[in-house]
From Swiss-Prot:
Required for the formation of a threonylcarbamoyl group on adenosine at position 37 (t(6)A37) in tRNAs that read codons beginning with adenine. Is involved in the transfer of the threonylcarbamoyl moiety of threonylcarbamoyl-AMP (TC-AMP) to the N6 group of A37, together with TsaE and TsaB. TsaD likely plays a direct catalytic role in this reaction. The gene is tsaD. It comes from Prosthecochloris aestuarii (strain DSM 271 / SK 413). Keywords: Acyltransferase, Cytoplasm, Iron, Metal-binding, Transferase, tRNA processing. The lineage of its organism: Bacteria, Pseudomonadati, Chlorobiota, Chlorobiia, Chlorobiales. This is tRNA N6-adenosine threonylcarbamoyltransferase. It catalyses: L-threonylcarbamoyladenylate + adenosine(37) in tRNA = N(6)-L-threonylcarbamoyladenosine(37) in tRNA + AMP + H(+). Substrate binds at T136, V137, S138, G139, G140, D169, G182, D186, N284.
């Protein structure tokens, strides 16, 4: 079975073909236009998707060495995401499915991220046979949930203000780094001292001693942004430039340590021995290393997607559609689908 996946939820235009559960093409076109603005401009993102969608889909089909008529299913992100951006991909998928007389499967973007760790050409380890804890962490989302084998979810924690990826990008902007700042901070931090300055870890046992906070799996990163801004304002530009790698490492440690701490604590509280980490921030080298070390200490299995599947991509959309079809969790015949506003667990 050949499934075409389409992803346009933010600033990546992507199309992929999954054949019998294995990725055989995955084309991603990142929109560089947003760098000049220090963040994604929704209207520009939608226009870029409109400009790129045909060529990206054609490239994915050609790389798969098939014809469009060989496709069995069309799958597309139906949200959450930037509404205009989502609608470009979803409407294109609707039209393509209708023209080819193929079924259409709408896919939840967050759900696809959760299962991106199990894309077959990426992971040697099989998916866990029992429930697992999922940390989904990106520029727009930071969420912990329990994933059941019937593809149902229980959200146990989420950000109450800013997402972790946004914290990376906004603090990077304060430091004068290019957008997206996450990968730049990751590179700088390799040369820096993560203990150079202790930035706050909100909603953790380090910030409060009461049991309610130790059992709280929500996240908060707005205070970190304020702390970084205050730190920068009390030092001259020469000092900041001289210690840029140390500051980057300290910011990164403040973000990743909270993600690791809460994810491990959730697994321990609920007696679950498997964790998956996905989303754009899962590409961060410090997060991957720290989470692996913590899981090894606790005897927990860790599943993280390869770097290409960490950020937004259509392979995860097609793979999620394939999984839902295999488990009878979707009816792929509705051309009149509306975008999802959120992830419900």
């Amino acid at each position: 079975m050949n499934i075409l996946g389409i992803e346009t939820s933010c600033d990546e235009t992507s199309a992929a073909v999954v054949q019998n559960g294995r990725v055989i093409s995955n084309i991603i076109s990142s929109q560089l236009i947003h760098r000049d603005f220090g963040g994604v401009v929704p209207e520009l993102a939608s226009r870029e998707h409109e400009r790129l969608i045909v060529s990206v889909v054609d490239a994915a089909v050609n790389e798969a060495n098939i014809q469009k008529n060989d496709l069995d299913i069309i799958a597309a992100t139906a949200g959450p995401g930037l509404i205009g951006a989502v609608m470009v991909g979803l409407c294109f998928a609707q039209g393509m499915a209708y023209a080819l007389k193929k079924p259409l499967v709408p896919v939840n973007h967050i759900e696809a991220h959760i299962f991106s760790a199990f894309i077959r050409d990426d992971s040697d380890a099989p998916p866990p046979e029992n429930d697992f804890i999922s940390l989904t962490v990106s520029g727009g989302h930071t969420m912990l949930c329990i994933v059941n084998q019937d593809l149902s979810y229980k959200v146990i924690g989420r950000t109450i203000d800013d997402a972790a990826g946004e914290a990376f990008d906004k603090t990077g902007k304060m430091l004068g780094l290019d957008y997206p700042a996450g990968p730049v901070i990751d590179r700088l931090a390799k040369e820096g001292n993560p203990k150079f300055h202790h930035f706050p870890r909100a909603l953790t046992a380090q910030s409060r001693t009461s049991k309610s906070y130790r059992d709280n799996f929500d996240f908060s990163f707005s205070g970190l942004k304020t702390s970084v801004l205050q730190y920068i304002s009390t030092h001259d530009s020469a000092y900041i430039e001289r210690h840029l790698s140390d500051i980057a490492a300290s910011v990164q440690e403040a973000i990743t340590s909270v993600l690791v701490m809460k994810t491990i604590a959730a697994a321990e509280k609920y007696g679950i021995d498997a964790i998956s980490v996905a989303g754009g921030v899962s590409a961060n080298s410090r997060l991957r290393h720290s989470m692996q070390e913590a899981c090894d200490r606790q005897g927990i299995r860790l599943f993280i997607p390869g770097i290409v599947y960490s950020t937004d991509n259509a392979a995860m959309i097609a793979t999620m559609a394939n999984l839902k079809l295999e488990r009878g969790k979707t009816e792929p015949n509705n051309y009149d689908v509306a975008p999802f506003a959120s992830f419900r667990g």
